[in-house]
């Protein structure tokens, strides 16, 4: 009783802590009973029992620490002279439960460094796991990588988005100039679907060709528009593998390129005027806007206007599709959050033991970020069919 005759306040946290301690004690007692029964069967006799059919003799015990969702449990594991330790119940190497493995996997994907993961398990469970343990548990993500790489692609996917983000990938004591190449598409249900993730050179035709070939081999069909930046290697790969498909240059990437050719003091105004071109009511209005923009800035910003003029046609292909889709198909901005998460997570890891481990993590991050796509429809694909009927009439 506290000073003043009052009982200390009972909090929910205190009650929960007491219950967890009670459950841990019950689990420990139960496990030790099972282990003793297992040893008795193995030896052929109980404690101090003298029988003629004895097969072995007891040889003490050793402590085994188990990590569970209720916390750390120290168990006394008996052993025999001939057979060693018993452990059919606990499992000789089963020192952490599926809950702990799930915790480590989630921490790994969500950007917790190996050191922080060790601190996390120590705080929650009373034992720090090693860097190698985190990496070993993370290999369970290999199934997700394989599933994404091999999953059949069913139905027509009219809009295919391709983009890449640079990854500071370090392994085998060297830094490789690689990027995470990502492909997603709008499917027949109008939802976005992550189709593929791989590592390669952003400007490499071979890297993009490999990814596109894999998508086609898995059943990708019905592509009407590819939305991507104007990297030479990417464009060449699309021309090779999807020669009949129209290509939309990402308007945001074009705007950024234009702004780099203008002085800082003019960029805010120029950015607003260039963006207005791609919000015009139709292609004719956009072309008229370009003419006015050229007349206004040609003398002061010749390089910026040359860049805009050169990329204008490729950036306005979206005007040939249903107006309700324009906002969704003129940029690859849908991948901006994914790129940010990939950069953040790979930076937290620092260095990967090999290329496969880097791909494993990046794929897991991509699946996590894009999981929300299944919650809502991105576009109404029936508008494409309506447009085709109207154009054919």
Predicted regions and their residues:
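Amphipathic alpha-helical transducer elements in NTP-driven molecular machines
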Residues: 16, 20, 24, 28, ...
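Acidic/histidine-rich catalytic cores and adjacent linkers
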Residues: 1-8, 12, 26, 37, ...
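RNase H-like nuclease fold core
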Residues: 76-81, 88-94, 99, 127-128, ...
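Conserved beta-strand -> loop -> alpha-helix junction used to position metal-binding or nucleic-acid-contacting
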Residues: 225-232, 237-273
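Conserved, well-folded catalytic cores of nucleic-acid-processing
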Residues: 41-45, 107-110, 123, 127, ...
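Short, flexible loop/hinge motifs at secondary-structure junctions
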Residues: 1-110, 114, 119-143, 147-159
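Mobile genetic element proteins and their domesticated derivatives, centered on retroelements
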Residues: 35, 39, 70, 82, ...
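Metal-dependent DNA phosphodiester-chemistry modules and their immediately adjacent helices/loops
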Residues: 86, 258-288, 292
